[in-house]
Amino acid sequence: MTASLKAIDGAADPGAELAAMMTALGAQARAAARVLAIAPTAQKNEALAAMERAIRAHTPAILQANAEDVAEARAGGATDAFIDRLTLTEARVAVMADGIGVIHDIADPVGQVTERWQRPNGMTIERVRVPLGVIAVIFESRPNVAADAGVLALKSGNAVILRGGSDSFRSCRAIHDCLVEGLREAGLPEAAITRVPVRDRAAVGLLLGGLDGNVDVIVPRGGKSLVARVEAEARVPVFAHLEGINHVYVDRAADLDMAKSIVLNAKMRRPGVCGAAETLLIDRAAASNLAPLVTTLLEAGCEVRGDDAVQRVDPRVKPVAEEDWDTEYEAAIMSVKLVDGVDAALAHIAQHGSHHTEAIVTADQSVASKFLNEVDAAIVLHNASTQFADGGEFGFGAEIGIATGKFHARGPVGAEQLTSFKYRVHGTGQIRP
């Protein structure tokens, strides 16, 4: 235990000590952000390369820390989906390291000139990407978020304060140690990637308050209650990552084999991730597709819930409740419904979707275009699984979250989305008449 944490434990007023510690973290992050904002690309990439090496070299320590977190979660009665999100394996740590390598290789967004034009008076105006400043990332059970958020913030010239959930506390500490090792090796301030070193939930409230103006944006990664609290209490802008109530619509013009493959992957590849599909909508004009699609899910171990028409397909189908259409199961459960074409599918999604990810399976390009244009979601797919809702799959290397709002960033939030812009105006002595 560090001296500062011992002081909090033994303080007459632990709340005041925690507030002082968090305020200091914010001030240190702000100072680091000023350094990162002007850090050369080569120096940031040197840190990223060192971080990748450290993650690979310290994989055994990361896995040991994670095993302790998982054991504690199991003892506490955590669900299988929760355990899946919490668990790291050698392969998952390797993917984490690979993602850092991808972020190393992508273009540095800072300083990019996105537009340039000349005014009639001879002035030249440029719009240039700049960092946001200090980002606070509050997340729950996914320890890989610590790495993703840390390296994306670094690449985009931002400092970041990581507040992982108590369930992944040890895992995040081990990963954070590797990130700090990389910063140190490249000569960048260690406060560029800061981890809240206590489990006290009061730290979240202090982050939401902005730490005396030292936090510029907050990214919540977690369940509905966490996101709701952040949106209700935050005094700084929020990139909201809401639940993934995602749908797959199988149109009358869909190839059945393709539909079976996509639906199975969308639900069962990893049922607990935010890109998993929760509802299957099938065009009533191709009701013959219902039985094979339902059977495919059932035989893969997925619980299927449906109305009377769906239940008649197989006695294993369970009745669907109205609230099921609004539920992110995070488990091997899928609601199934027959709808009267693409318009009815769009209406159902408009009523029950969470603006996260939606997919259509069809060979009819006009129907696909209608769906892609009209559905209100951050990510819309044609003939592909919803599980591609991932920054790594988009070529971003990783993501800090999937923003489901419509301001500033939407969809996978990568390095480019963690920048704002400024206008640079070049004159030759012009004055305004």
UniProtKB/Swiss-Prot annotation:
Q: Enumerate the GO terms in the molecular function aspect.
A: glutamate-5-semialdehyde dehydrogenase activity; NADP binding
Cell location: Cytoplasm
Q: Which HAMAP family match?
A: ProA
In Pfam terms, one family for this protein is Aldedh
Q: What EC number(s) does this enzyme carry? A: 1.2.1.41
What biological process terms from GO does the record include? Answer: L-proline biosynthetic process
Name of this chain's protein: Gamma-glutamyl phosphate reductase
State the family named in the UniProt similarity comment for this chain. Answer: Belongs to the gamma-glutamyl phosphate reductase family.
Q: Which residues form a coiled coil?
A: none
EC main group: oxidoreductase
Catalytic activities: L-glutamate 5-semialdehyde + phosphate + NADP(+) = L-glutamyl 5-phosphate + NADPH + H(+)
Q: What does this protein do?
A: Catalyzes the NADPH-dependent reduction of L-glutamate 5-phosphate into L-glutamate 5-semialdehyde and phosphate. The product spontaneously undergoes cyclization to form 1-pyrroline-5-carboxylate.
One GO cellular component this record assigns the protein to is: cytoplasm
Specify the species.
Answer: Rhodopseudomonas palustris (strain BisB18)
Please tell me where this protein is predominantly located.
Answer: cytoplasm
According to UniProt, this protein's pathway is: Amino-acid biosynthesis; L-proline biosynthesis; L-glutamate 5-semialdehyde from L-glutamate: step 2/2
Q: Which gene encodes it?
A: proA
Gene3D superfamilies (UniProt xref): Aldehyde Dehydrogenase, Chain A, domain 1, Aldehyde Dehydrogenase, Chain A, domain 2
Q: Which UniProt keywords apply?
A: Amino-acid biosynthesis, Cytoplasm, NADP, Oxidoreductase, Proline biosynthesis
Disulphide bridges: none
